[in-house]
Amino acid sequence: MPMQGAQRKLLGSLNSTPTATSNLGLAANRTGAPCLELPIPNGLFLSLGLVSLVENVLVVAAIAKNRNLHSSMYCFICCLALSDLLVSGSNMLETAVILLLEAGVLATRASVVQQLHNTIDVLTCSSMLCSLCFLGAIAVDRYISIFYALRYHSIMTLPRAQRAVAAIWVASVLSSTLFITYYDHAAVLLCLMVFFLAMLVLMAVLYVHMLARARQHAQGIIRLHKRQPPAHKGFGLRGAATLTILLGIFFLCWGPFFLCLTLVVFCPQHLTCNCIFKNFKVFLTLIICNTIIDPLIYAFRSQELRRMLKEVLGRGRW
């Protein structure tokens, strides 16, 4: 699975950069001018993937075992963990296959390798799309729980959540198959970028609106109990900080990846863009880091889920 150019494959060619890495250094571009390249050691990449794998397996197992967690909110959190698990697992699998092929340990026909390569690409792409969709679904679920609190349980029923989950998975797999099949069309990469921006805007609008409602609610409590204004100010700052961290992590971890795909469309031959393409594995590593952070933000803050995790780990059985 050698690198054939940044525009050759949606995820395949960009992800199949040479796996042998060295310390931080400068790589030459096509004219010999220096490019800053940040090599990611395979050991580090696989270790991060393993941490993500274990972490998200624990989340899925804890939610599956506890009936108290069988609600629409935890359904979306469980599916986010499952999609993050597949993101890290598929990237680990591809890296392992590349290493085995380069070492000569895995010897098979080129057609089999290509078929495996395409399958992993579809799995990686679909799990990434699912991860983004479930981040958006969690934001929508929380928005409804705040603005339609009295009707929340009638709106966000478990069957409806399950139908939404099924629709997301089916749409992601079908879209990924089309994206990988027609990887050489610029519209494919542009669609992915538009999808990322849509999710970013959706999350930003919903969470900002939720923050505004929370501040309004806090202000009402202050007036009711005649507390001092600094308490309200402190709440607003904490809420703004939480929102900044949540959206900042999302943009930092996913933004470079989709920016790289956009540059493949607009400047595939430009020297600066080619320097950016050389760091594609860094962008994938950021996504793996996001799959590690997601459970900390969305799952482990739940006291009930933490208690269930302690039971799962304490008993040593699923």
Swiss-Prot record:
The keyword Membrane applies. Belongs to the G-protein coupled receptor 1 family. Residues 1-37, 94-118, 184-191, 267-279 are extracellular. Keywords: Cell membrane, G-protein coupled receptor, Glycoprotein, Membrane, Receptor, Transducer, Transmembrane, Transmembrane helix. This is Melanocyte-stimulating hormone receptor. Residues 64-72, 141-163, 212-240, 301-318 are cytoplasmic. The keyword Phosphoprotein does not apply. The gene is MC1R. Receptor for MSH (alpha, beta and gamma) and ACTH. The activity of this receptor is mediated by G proteins which activate adenylate cyclase. Mediates melanogenesis, the production of eumelanin (black/brown) and phaeomelanin (red/yellow), via regulation of cAMP signaling in melanocytes. Glycans are attached at residue 29. It is a multi-pass membrane protein. Pfam families: 7tm_1. It is found in: Cell membrane. One of its GO terms (cellular component) is plasma membrane. GO terms for molecular function: melanocyte-stimulating hormone receptor activity. The chain crosses the membrane at residues 38-63, 73-93, 119-140, 164-183, 192-211, 241-266, 280-300. It comes from Leontopithecus chrysopygus. One of its GO terms (biological process) is adenylate cyclase-activating G protein-coupled receptor signaling pathway. Interacts with MGRN1, but does not undergo MGRN1-mediated ubiquitination; this interaction competes with GNAS-binding and thus inhibits agonist-induced cAMP production. Interacts with OPN3; the interaction results in a decrease in MC1R-mediated cAMP signaling and ultimately a decrease in melanin production in melanocytes. Its main location: membrane. InterPro entries: GPCR_Rhodpsn, GPCR_Rhodpsn_7TM, Melcrt_ACTH_rcpt, MSH_rcpt.
